Amino acid sequence: NDSISKLYVADGEDSGSSSLLAPRESEITFSTSQEITVKKFTSLGLKNIDMVVIDTQGYELEVLKGFESYINAIPCFIIEFANYEGYLKQPVYKELNLFMRKKGFVPIAQIKRINKPFPNINGGSFGDALYVDKKLLRKSEIIFFTIRYYLINLIIYDAFIFFKKRLKKSLKRYIGR
């Protein structure tokens, strides 16, 4: 089940932006690429895993698919997400969340960073989401976390937080004079 894929390598201090997905035009330069072997999780033979952290620069959904049926043996995932397409054909958070919910996971928490209040190809919000297998939660917890998820992921919420931070910076500069 191994496959050979092209890794687009970001230059210099942006090397953390290297990805298996082709880059969009941006301020980050990708002057080289290299062929790498991509393995499915199921081919690694690992067992008894309590938590998985996935940060693969837009390739998270493909990594999750590589878990196949073993995904339901893992109680907890922390997954990087973006609500904009930072790389060509990058699944956005909505698609990632739908996949996880169909597999029986509930989004419990997010660490979210907002670089643009309204998502477009040049930015939006991104961060990490914690998912827990719903079999480990009470029904009331599932309801609570589901409502909180929808409130936190409204674009209006992102815009509010973004402009609130800008207002604070402006006030500090104005008051600091």
What are the residue ranges of the model-derived segments?
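Phosphate/nucleotide-binding beta-alpha loop and adjacent structural elements of enzyme active sites
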Residues: 1-177
